Amino acid sequence: MSNCRTLTLLLGALLAARHAHCSPNCPPGDRALGRCMPTAEERVNIDITPEDLLPENPSTFIQFIHHSYSEMVRVLKKTAAKCSQISKTYSIGRSYEGKDLLVIEFSANPGQHEVLTPEFRYIGNMHGNEVVGRELLIYLAQFLCSEYLLGNSRIQTLINTTRIHLLPSMNPDGYEHAAEMGAGYNGWTNGRQNAQNIDLNRNFPDLTSEAHKLIRMPLARLDHMPIPESYWDGKIAPETKAVMKWMRSIPFVISGSLHGGDLVISYPYDFSRHPLEEKMLSPTPDEKVFQLLAKTYVAAHPMMSDKSTSRCGGNFNSKGGIINGAEWYSFSGGMADFSYLHTNCFELTLELGCEKFPTEDELYSIWQNNKEAMLGLIEMVHRGIKGIVKDEYGNPIKKARISVRGIRHDIITGEDGDYFRLLIPGSHIVSAEAFGYSRVTKKITLPAKMLKAGRVDFVLQRVDVRNRKFPKVIPEDIYERFDPLDRFDPHAQHGGAEPSEGDEVSSRNGEKPWWWSYFSMLGHNRPSWLLKKNENKM
């Protein structure tokens, strides 16, 4: 947006507000926001420039422009500083060319997971030439900060009850390459990949192929599937590793991956259940939940919900603006499938416009079309049920399974024993179980218009494990055995370096891995070849 247009919009806002506050006793905050008419003294000898019209704290002036990497970092850090009581920035790692993958977080207690507070994430710019998501998340960060400080009750409630993470650019290297062509260039490949020429949305472990095989086994669960060891033999982008570690470090409930090139909401599975079928409906066990999430975004987006609109050379009106990913086009190694099958998190792919790199004069209308939809999707983390699983002494039980009858996908409790289970309205049979404990089952009913998660706690009794069969549970070390992600720590600020070859291997809690004791007697002959093998797979 040009300075001239910015100035026009701001002047229009000032004129529109002239009837709102005419009292000479105008509150300072309202005066700074331009909600009050200036006094006679204030109207004398004023040379108006766009900079003069920038509202002061607490408001944030959103410039609807494209942001370079340095500009994006500056805006995010400035926003976090302005709202330091509810916001902070952190890096989850670095891109191949060394740029921080910077996240801005909003919550009542930034930097910490709070029991029974759901976690949400948005990821933008996974493909470097698809820039709409990048800009929308920069705008959203400023909007959340500004509206919170202005006393917007909806935003204050959202931030006080939710932990929100925004990663505007997963592929900053690709963006810089695409930006060289300039806004308006709508090429489909320039800058799409990262600096290693890797498509990040084809670079995640393919767990979907195995899930399609397991579906034929009646007792098999389609959740928290381990990463195949063979995956580490391939070429893995540092951006992919960083996001995978991030996914596992925080108990996200819902995620939205923002893309461009079409106007539709896609949901898992993205990989067809039949390898020879390019367009085959391949639903997850949570098909109805995914449809509910996708329809929520579409309903709040004026263009997606407009049934008279034919979009981007295609038309998804017959499907209500949503589509199963594999039914649209099939591919493996996608982030959304991995998120669903490896973690607790349900991820949507949000295709937000026909143009991948729109011009600046289109950005304001794109923001207006998506603002309400983005907020609405975040609020969906408060649907379904949540609770805490404890033993009879009140101690939380981590890694307990939360099962829903008829849905072959379980949710796992976190370190504090809390869980969040998205469900559609209606009646459900829900169970909690953990190794060494009795199983507890409850019947619940969720009203159609319930706007917050129902509280369903479980108390499990200790039982004698001898001569008793237990259902398959998540092993304590499922993420530790020979898993290179435990050798990769992207959470050090500014992308801390990976451990060097000479560093000793340890598990997440700082102890030696489970197999180390078998070799301790070997002294200097301990199996360094085994360590090197795993390190090389990084």
Question: Locations of the language-model features?
Answer:
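Loop/turn elements at helix/coil->beta-strand transitions in domains of secreted/extracellular proteins
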Residues: 85-87, 99-101, 117-119, 160-165, ...
